A protein has these predicted regions:
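A short beta-strand-loop-beta hairpin characteristic of the jelly-roll/cupin
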Residues: 49-61
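Cyclic nucleotide-binding regulatory module and flanking cytosolic helices
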Residues: 1-27, 76-79
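Short helix-to-loop capping/linker segments positioned immediately adjacent to catalytic or ligand/cofactor-binding
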Residues: 85-86, 106-112, 131-140, 158-161
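Glycine- and acidic-residue-biased ligand/ion/polar-headgroup-sensing regions
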Residues: 28, 39-52, 67-69
Length: 207
C-alpha cells in the first residue's frame, strides 16, 4: 500500500501536502480517457479500476485491474505534458484519492512520512513492472488455451490454492488476454471436458 509504514496521525498531513482530492465514481464510468493530460496520480480507496488500451475501431484490451491500495497514472503525473495513451475506467464503481505526487518529488526537505511514501511509491511502480512482465508471458502464448492455462496457473500461485476466484467476467477476461470472447468460452468448455478445470462464473478449480 502507498501508506504502509506511515502512522495514521501523519497521513492527514501528507495528504494535505499533496493536495489530495477524493472522488467517487459510479459503475461503468470513465475516470480518465485516452488523450487527456493529467497532473495527478490516482490512489484506489474502494472497489477497483481498469486500465484500458483502445484501438482506432474502439476495441478494448484490459491492461490491468487495480484494486484497493493501488496507484495509477503516476508516470503521466510526473511527466505532465504527455497525453494519456490509455483510459482508466470504473466498471464496478470506484473511490479514488488524487495526489499531486510531483510535489513529493520536488520537495527538498521531506518529512520522514513523505520519505516513506516515496519509498512505497517506488515499490508500487516496481510491482507494476513485474505484473506487466507477467502479462507479456500470457500474451506471447500462441493459442487461447495456452493463454488461459498460463493466467490460471499464475492466479493459483498467487492465491496459493487450486480453487481460485478471478476479478474478471468473461468479456473482461477475453479483453485482458486479447482473445475473442466466443472462442475463449468455447476453449474453457473444452478444458473442462478434458479434465483440466472446473468453473462457474469467475470461480475456477484447477484439476
Amino acid at each position: 500500500s502507498l501508506f504502509r509504514g506511515i502512522a495514521k496521525t501523519e497521513i492527514a498531513a501528507v495528504l494535505q501536502n499533496l493536495d489530495a482530492q477524493l472522488r467517487v465514481y459510479p459503475r461503468n464510468s470513465f475516470i480518465w480517457q485516452l488523450g487527456e493530460q493529467v497532473t495527478t496520480a490516482g490512489f484506489v480507496v474502494a472497489v477497483s479500476v481498469h486500465i484500458l488500451r483502445e484501438d482506432y475501431w474502439g476495441r478494448q484490451n484490459i491492461l490491468a485491474q487495480l484494486g484497493c491500495g493501488h496507484l495509477f497514472g503516476e508516470v503521466y503525473a510526473c511527466l505532465r505534458q504527455v497525453p494519456l495513451t490509455v483510459s482508466v475506467a470504473a466498471p464496478n464503481g470506484a473511490t479514488v484519492i488524487f495526489l499531486d505526487i510531483k510535489r513529493l518529488l520536488a520537495g527538498s526537505a521531506r518529512s520522514e512520512a513523505e520519505n516513506r511514501l516515496l519509498h512505497n511509491l517506488l515499490l508500487l511502480m516496481a510491482e507494476r513492472n513485474l505484473f506487466l512482465t507477467q502479462k507479456m508471458e500470457y500474451l506471447t502464448k500462441r493459442t487461447t488455451r495456452e493463454k488461459l492455462l498460463a493466467y490460471l496457473s499464475e492466479q493459483a500461485r498467487l492465491q496459493q490454492s487450486n480453487k481460485l476466484t478471478i476479478p474478471f467476467n468473461r468479456q473482461q477476461l477475453a479483453d485482458f488476454l486479447a482473445v475473442d470472447r466466443s472462442a475463449m468460452s468455447g476453449e474453457l468448455s473444452k478444458m473442462q471436458a478434458d479434465g483440466l478445470i472446473r468453473y462457474r462464473k469467475n470461480n475456477f478449480e484447477l484439476l
